Amino acid sequence: MSLDNDINTKKRKLQDDEKPRKKRKHKRPTRDDDADLDVEAGLNRAFARMDGQLLADHLAQKTRRFGTELSSVELNDLYISAASIRDSSSFEKDRTLENLPSFLEKFAQEKEKLDEAPKKNGSPHTLIVAAAGLRAADLVRACRKFQKKGSPVAKLFAKHFKLEEQVAFLNKTRTGIAVGTPQRLIDLIEHGALSVENLRRIVVDASHIDQKKRNITDMRETMMPLAKLLARADFKERYTDEKKHIDLLFY
């Protein structure tokens, strides 16, 4: 090989070495809870096994993930303690719409009649929190067992219902069970139309997943309002209060 050819070969090798190497495509890691996602049933089965501590940790992790604009103090105000959450892992049935009445009955107070409404208008004993209006409508239908004349299940979500209509409904109607989305429930409480005076339990529809395998804690637009709703001072102080206790349950 001539000297010129040898020099040209070395130049080409140096040029090849200087070319940026193509990055290897990494496969997207599988979600830790993929095994618990039952798409056919529309359930994330992990929630059925979580006790108060696991749920508190899960909520804190999601709040930190979506609350990036908040200070550490503001985030801390949104955290819920394990002691605030009632353990419902003893419920053995699938957490489907059909089994919601059984769940409510299992964790109701002794001799409590869920189809009866407190005497004060707009003051339910049970709040059920859903991710979206369509799901909330399904939950309302699932609770028909507890609906009777003088105690309708309240529909407190934005889809097809204006805030003013719901304010008017609550002002003139007694209701035992109310189903709503986080932000609309906050708006109605702050408006003064939805009273929490007689509230005995909050049930978060957590196991349900949508077609994209997301539950109420998996989306910023639902998780952050949920965190703010559950961490309200008038709720937080009652999670561990014996006299005016509120059960916080995750279905």
From Swiss-Prot:
SUPFAM superfamilies xref list: P-loop containing nucleoside triphosphate hydrolases
Subcellular location: Nucleus
Region named Disordered: 1-37
Signal peptide feature range: none
InterPro entries: Cms1, P-loop_NTPase
The keyword Ribosomal protein is annotated on this UniProt entry: no
Classification via Pfam families: CMS1 (PF14617)
The keyword Repressor belongs to this UniProt entry's keyword annotation: no
Cellular component aspect of the GO annotation: 90S preribosome; nucleus
Assigned keywords, A-Z: Nucleus
Gene3D superfamilies with a match to the protein in the record: P-loop containing nucleotide triphosphate hydrolases (3.40.50.300)
Ranges that cross the membrane: none
Summary of the function given for this chain in its UniProt record: May play a role in the regulation of DNA replication and cell cycle control.
Family under the similarity heading: Belongs to the CMS1 family.
Protein known as: Protein CMS1
Organism: Chaetomium thermophilum (strain DSM 1495 / CBS 144.50 / IMI 039719) (Thermochaetoides thermophila)
